[in-house]
């Protein structure tokens, strides 16, 4: 059988699609909001989304907090901020969705800060 060569971008897109379906199915079954992380080279965003109601419950980003970039220190601030907003609305347990990115660097820093602030995932 002929081996198919996928580009790195195509592989990442397929992996992200698989993970999105898996996370969404888990969230619908568990009735928990999803903490969705999005990052670029310059900034990092975190949103708390309820897929059952299709609404964003809370959001935080390095842009909203007027931080100059999305480095690890600023990712920690975003993680603590989103956790504070989630706890204020009564959500202690969430499902973590990193959008196919590796759990490393800024993603890990944001997740650790959210856990330290009281979120469970």
From Swiss-Prot:
The Swiss-Prot or TrEMBL record annotates one GO molecular function as: 5S rRNA binding
Q: Does the keyword Disulfide bond apply?
A: no
Q: Which residues form a coiled coil?
A: none
Q: How does it assemble?
A: Part of the 50S ribosomal subunit; part of the 5S rRNA/L5/L18/L25 subcomplex. Contacts the 5S and 23S rRNAs.
Q: What is the protein named?
A: Large ribosomal subunit protein uL18
Q: Which InterPro entries match?
A: Ribosomal_uL18_bac-type, Ribosomal_uL18_bac/euk
Organism placement in taxonomy: Bacteria, Bacillati, Mycoplasmatota, Mycoplasmoidales, Mycoplasmoidaceae
Q: Mind naming one GO cellular-component term on file for this protein?
A: cytosolic large ribosomal subunit
* Assigned protein family: Belongs to the universal ribosomal protein uL18 family.
Q: Name one matching Pfam family.
A: Ribosomal_L18p
HAMAP family, alphabetized: Ribosomal_uL18_B
Organism, as annotated: Ureaplasma urealyticum serovar 10 (strain ATCC 33699 / Western)
- UniProt keyword Ribosomal protein present: yes
Gene Ontology annotations of biological process type: translation
Cited function: This is one of the proteins that bind and probably mediate the attachment of the 5S RNA into the large ribosomal subunit, where it forms part of the central protuberance.
Keywords attached to this entry: Ribonucleoprotein, Ribosomal protein, RNA-binding, rRNA-binding
């Amino acid at each position: 059988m002929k081996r198919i060569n996928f580009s790195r971008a195509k592989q990442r897109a397929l992996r992200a699609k698989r993970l999105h379906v898996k996370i969404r199915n888990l969230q619908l079954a568990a009735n928990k909001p999803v903490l969705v992380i999005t990052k670029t080279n310059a900034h990092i965003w975190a949103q708390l989304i309820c897929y059952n109601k299709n609404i964003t419950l809370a959001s935080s980003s390095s842009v909203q907090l007027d931080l100059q970039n999305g480095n690890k220190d600023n990712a920690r601030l975003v993680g603590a901020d989103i956790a504070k907003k989630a706890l204020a609305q009564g959500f202690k347990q969430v499902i973590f969705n990193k959008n196919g990115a590796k759990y490393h660097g800024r993603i890990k820093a944001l997740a650790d800060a959210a856990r330290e602030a009281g979120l469970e995932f």
